[in-house]
């Protein structure tokens, strides 16, 4: 996907730079803009990133691509002979670019040069005065308030406030005894304790493989910031668990999906979390890669709605049925049968998977529940198609911030008005395009990697403040071992060294 070399730069695409004179627009290196968290030494992310906005010589911003190779990016460590950094320049096709880079070692300082035809852009070169730590470096900032400021985290997050409002207090002693009794035999749970910035776990139930996603984000957080001592339970299953109607004796359980019929505390989904941790690693679908693969411009997109997936909900069967009746409006098909195998002859045959990026050849994306909320919604929103979202009792951590008719087109849960909504979108093309743009902006501004880290920390911080007894390393718990250091490029934490010298 990318190479690592002495100075690693990767550029996507082959469109030449715009450098014409005369009546053509000319890109201005001086007036173009560069900003973002990847220019700050102390913002540690698995893949750091910043933005470039192309501006012409008259000061006007480009609103379409000025060419995918107009900017050249070089990242180096002036004090080192070798620099292990993978770099990608992603053209968002709207006049802006994401530059993302993944570090495989830590450096005293880091120099970022952005050029256009050999000329520095904006205030390039940018020097990150370090140490600048890579993702696997265990060097937490002790001052969590300072970390929150560096990360530019929101003061309050409404979904967290709503979820925690069900629990005026939390007693770790009580939940340690009661939750395993109530849920431990029938469900898949992880009992975690964070103590002295170390992670401990005890699993309950048979199918606990998904703990790897929770282990990974907790270890990543503890490498970056001093986490509060906290004890909690994570539901590894699809469905939210705490369904008691009254507040009496409800249990705080963390889940990746919430519902209007449950009281679970919602976290970012394991899918979105994993895509953040593995950006420029083992995943190819993430919130940044989508932005560089949004297909043709709106006017050139296919005017049918597209959907692919498995048969995990009866409404999906209805969608495929609608597609067969109205192929001029909907292109929907199953890629796998599992839940309704006996109906495969009616709703099959199954079709081959298509690249997620190929979805954006279509103007209209249908988001419909699977077993719970469809975890693809963040990626659909950050593309440049308009999303038709099914009404649902299920929600992810950000749904309460979305507004129907502003960020997406709502569709009734039984899909009875889907055809009507599609026809509306076709007849109101400019309005549909505006909704697509608003949804995209929401995802760009709220669902990036730093937003996910902020959400997790604020959630655990708020939960820890409710505890009325001290979290404990319970009987049967084992430490979640951190990743071993790279012997070739070890991490030397200056914070730990300074603390040891006190």
Curated annotation (Swiss-Prot):
Listed GO CC annotations: cytosol; endoplasmic reticulum lumen; nucleoplasm
Tissue specificity comment: Widely expressed.
Entry's EC annotation: 2.4.1.-, 2.4.2.-
Signal peptide: 1-19
Post-translational modification: N-glycosylated.
Gene3D superfamilies: Immunoglobulins
Stated role: Protein glucosyltransferase that catalyzes the transfer of glucose from UDP-glucose to a serine residue within the consensus sequence peptide C-X-N-T-X-G-S-F-X-C. Can also catalyze the transfer of xylose from UDP-xylose but less efficiently. Specifically targets extracellular EGF repeats of proteins such as NOTCH1, NOTCH3, FBN1, FBN2 and LTBP1. May regulate the transport of NOTCH1 and NOTCH3 to the plasma membrane and thereby the Notch signaling pathway.
Name the record gives this protein: Protein O-glucosyltransferase 2
Source organism (scientific name): Mus musculus (Mouse)
Gene: Poglut2
């Amino acid at each position: 996907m990318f190479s690592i070399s002495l100075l690693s730069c990767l550029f996507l695409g082959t469109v030449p730079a715009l450098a014409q004179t005369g009546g053509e627009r000319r890109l201005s290196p001086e007036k173009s803009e560069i900003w973002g968290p990847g220019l700050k030494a102390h913002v540690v992310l698995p893949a750091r990133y910043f933005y470039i906005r192309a501006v012409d010589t008259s000061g006007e911003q480009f609103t379409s691509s000025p060419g995918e190779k107009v900017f050249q990016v070089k990242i180096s460590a002036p004090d080192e002979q070798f620099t292990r950094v993978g770099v990608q320049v992603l053209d968002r096709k709207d006049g802006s670019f994401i530059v993302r880079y993944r570090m495989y070692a830590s450096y005293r300082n880091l120099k970022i040069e952005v050029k256009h035809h050999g000329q520095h852009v904006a205030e390039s070169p940018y020097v990150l005065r370090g140490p600048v730590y890579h993702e696997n470096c265990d060097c937490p900032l002790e001052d969590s308030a300072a970390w929150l400021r560096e990360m530019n985290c929101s003061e309050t997050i409404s979904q967290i406030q709503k979820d925690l409002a069900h629990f005026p207090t939390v007693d770790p002693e009580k939940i340690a005894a009661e939750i395993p009794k109530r849920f431990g035999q029938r469900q898949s749970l992880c009992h975690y304790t964070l103590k002295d910035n170390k992670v401990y776990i005890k699993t309950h139930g048979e199918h606990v493989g998904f703990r790897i996603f929770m282990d990974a984000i907790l270890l990543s957080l503890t490498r970056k910031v001093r986490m509060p001592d906290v004890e909690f339970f994570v539901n590894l299953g699809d469905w939210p668990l705490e369904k008691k109607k009254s507040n009496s004796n409800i249990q705080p359980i963390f889940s990746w999906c919430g519902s209007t019929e449950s009281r679970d505390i919602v976290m970012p989904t394991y899918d979105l979390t994993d895509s953040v941790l593995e950006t420029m690693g083992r995943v190819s679908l993430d919130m940044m890669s989508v932005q560089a693969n949004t297909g043709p411009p709106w006017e050139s997109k296919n005017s049918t709605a597209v959907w692919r997936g498995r048969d995990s909900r009866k409404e999906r069967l209805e969608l495929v049925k609608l597609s067969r009746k109205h192929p001029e409006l909907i292109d929907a098909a199953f890629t796998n049968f599992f839940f309704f195998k006996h109906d495969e002859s009616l709703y099959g045959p199954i079709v081959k998977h298509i690249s997620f990026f190929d979805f954006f050849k279509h103007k209209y994306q249908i988001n419909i529940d699977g077993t719970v909320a469809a975890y693809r919604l963040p990626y659909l929103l950050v593309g440049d198609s308009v999303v038709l979202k099914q009404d649902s009792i299920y929600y992810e951590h950000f749904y309460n911030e979305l507004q129907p008719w502003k960020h997406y087109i709502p569709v009734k849960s039984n899909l009875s008005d889907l055809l009507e909504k599609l026809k509306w979108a076709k007849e109101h093309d400019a309005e549909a395009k505006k909704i697509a743009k608003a949804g995209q902006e929401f995802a760009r501004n709220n669902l990036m990697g730093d937003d996910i880290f902020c959400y997790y920390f604020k959630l655990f911080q708020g939960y820890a403040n409710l505890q009325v007894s001290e979290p404990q390393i319970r009987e049967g718990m084992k430490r979640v071992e951190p990743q071993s250091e790279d012997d070739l490029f070890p991490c030397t934490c200056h914070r730990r060294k300074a603390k040891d010298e006190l």
